[in-house]
Amino acid sequence: MKNDRPDTFIITGDIDAMWLRDSSAQVWPYLPLMKDDRDLQFLIAGLINRQTECILIDPYANAFNDGPLGSYWETDHTQHMVKELHERKWEIDSLCYPIRLAYQYWTLTKDTSIFSADWHEAMKLVVRTFKEQQRKQGIGTYSFSRDCDRPTDSQINNGWGAPVKPVGLIVSSFRPSDDATQFGFLIPSNMFAVVSLRQLSEIEHTVYNHIDFAKECIALADEVDAAIRRYGTFNHPICGRVYAFEVDGFGNVLCMDDANIPSLLSAPYLGYCSFKDAVYQNTRKLIWSDNNPYFFKGKAGEGILSLIHI
């Protein structure tokens, strides 16, 4: 308990820190069991409250400590590395997962106690951060670089990443694997943002009666969705019209997928598109073939590799 509200801190497993993404995914399979287990519901409500607190500390951070404990990543070159942060890699999905968790919790329990004034303030910060990382008004306030011998652990151009053209998509400096993006517009994470913003709009409209903010969320979701359709797809010479993994808005595309969620493969699972969607089906064929540089096939099996494991 903290301030008379449930409070739950869930470590990622091998590190005594909480990732917004990991903690959401770790409890996701248990959500249907809440109806028969009040203690479990209390635990998950506590996690949602803690995620709210984390976002209010820093919406750009991906991993948090259980208090102002500091981190071995304190030497990273970034703007706001306070003691409560374990790591400060900007990943769009870090802000989508808490919305997804809160939405599903609410859908299953009808409990609105998690939707406090702080939760609403955190969501305003989420939308503000997404808009800043559309980079329509310049490169924004976030950069990240690390002194390391692993290039994918740091961003180029003094931490700002490769240039992007502001076309309505949202920059993600890092992927869900915590590896740096090559081109800033990570399409699977932008897909996730579209779904999350629409869920957020429903909550803000139904629970808070914040009509204007709900409309703002929908408008942003529609803008990002339209940009995905226009700039996040391309004609592959073998597979036809497919979704790109990353783009920069200038016409450059990265053709691959990563074994994580969000990924291109997981788009229907996250609710972005139908499994039968023609572009998705073409993309799926590409991903499960040697046209994907991170597809493997051997005598014992086949699958999708993650860059972090190569």
Q: What do these predicted regions represent?
A:
Residues 25-38, 97-112, 191-210, 265-276:
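Well-ordered alpha-helical scaffold segments within catalytic/enzyme domains
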Residues 1-6, 69-78, 163-175:
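Active-site-adjacent bridging/hinge elements
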Residues 58, 62, 131-148, 185, ...:
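Catalytic cores of carbohydrate-active enzymes
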Residues 16-44, 48-152:
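Aromatic-rich carbohydrate-recognition surfaces in CAZymes
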Residues 164-199, 244-253:
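Acidic/Ser/Thr-rich, low-complexity mid-to-C-terminal regulatory regions of eukaryotic proteins
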Residues 308-310:
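Conserved small/polar residues in nucleotide/adenosyl-binding loops
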Residues 1-4, 43-62, 121-138, 165-167, ...:
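Long, well-ordered core segments of solenoidal/helical folds
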Residues 1-21:
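Low-complexity, Ser/Thr/Pro/Gly-enriched N-terminal "stalk/linker" regions
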